[in-house]
Amino acid sequence: MKWSEICIHTTHEAVEPISNILHEAGASGVVIEDPLDLIKERENVYGEIYQLDPNDYPDEGVIIKAYLPINSFLGETVEGIKETINNLLLYDIDLGRNKITISEVNEEEWATAWKKYYHPVKISEKFTIVPTWEEYTPVHTDELIIEMDPGMAFGTGTHPTTVLCIQALERYVKEGDSVVDVGTGTGILSIASAMLRAKQVEGYDLDPVAVESARLNSKLNKVSDHIEIKQNNLLDGVEGEKDIIVANILAEVILRFTDQAYSLLKDGGYFITSGIIQQKKQEVKDALVKEGFTIVEVLSMEDWVSIIAKK
């Protein structure tokens, strides 16, 4: 079978939304070539686990590669991808070069070549993300391993916004807590919460592909008994008091449900938000304070921030 490789040269800011656009268009896996992977600060903090080849990465910006089967609908699909990516400009997302190229690859090449980009990555004091095909031996007895299959949907869990959320969850989730994960995607934040011994974890996503992916990943990591994944729009219809609400989505979306988050949280509960670019940080902070939250902490990595607010 022949595959079409779509390469998009863009910015760090646009990686997450463009990756989601590609998955929603039916891409069988997404590869992110980011030169910052060669020098990321977290590698200095948590230790180098693998070696990367600089020749695989662009000099500037980020290259996103996605793979679509070659069929009669390919042209229409590609045009739809281009249009949806350009619509990100309406959300003030910098697309950079936004250069898109298309080439053809054989199934044999695709089936193995993309795996070279994915290796175990330690992203916090406790958590290490490990691709399903990698053999990995924990370095510490209290190390928590999350297995992910990048070919399923929505990336590997090593994007800065996800890393920040997991680091925040590690700090604030207590044994027995109730956690709601808004826009769960792969389910990685729900999985991390369950591994941190949260008693009740709910993950919601509007995309049925994400819901299925999250359910599969929770089973893969043997925490499905502690997580309920449902298709849902943000916090609509969610009931009961929660200890923690976590949301790794665009700032514009977060601003739409700060009132619901405040209402659902117990007194003293935490609202952990990420997916926020530096330029939107103050706007989100102001909205949270206006709603009644107290800003406890702001974490940052590259161009992204995570804001932890307390009710």
UniProtKB/Swiss-Prot annotation:
Family of this protein: Belongs to the methyltransferase superfamily. PrmA family.
Gene name of the encoded protein: prmA
Disulfide bridges in this chain: none
Catalytic activity: L-lysyl-[protein] + 3 S-adenosyl-L-methionine = N(6),N(6),N(6)-trimethyl-L-lysyl-[protein] + 3 S-adenosyl-L-homocysteine + 3 H(+)
UniProt-recorded name of the protein: Ribosomal protein L11 methyltransferase
NCBIfam families: prmA
GO molecular function: protein-lysine N-methyltransferase activity
Subcellular location: Cytoplasm
Any Pfam family: PrmA
Enzyme class: transferase
Main location: cytoplasm
Organism in which the protein naturally occurs: Bacillus licheniformis (strain ATCC 14580 / DSM 13 / JCM 2505 / CCUG 7422 / NBRC 12200 / NCIMB 9375 / NCTC 10341 / NRRL NRS-1264 / Gibson 46)
Gene Ontology CC terms: cytoplasm
Function: Methylates ribosomal protein L11.
UniProt KW keywords: Cytoplasm, Methyltransferase, S-adenosyl-L-methionine, Transferase
SUPFAM superfamilies, A to Z: S-adenosyl-L-methionine-dependent methyltransferases
UniProt record, GO biological process: methylation
Superkingdom to which the source organism belongs: Bacteria
Binding-site residues for S-adenosyl-L-methionine, renumbered to this chain: 162, 183, 205, 248
EC number: 2.1.1.-
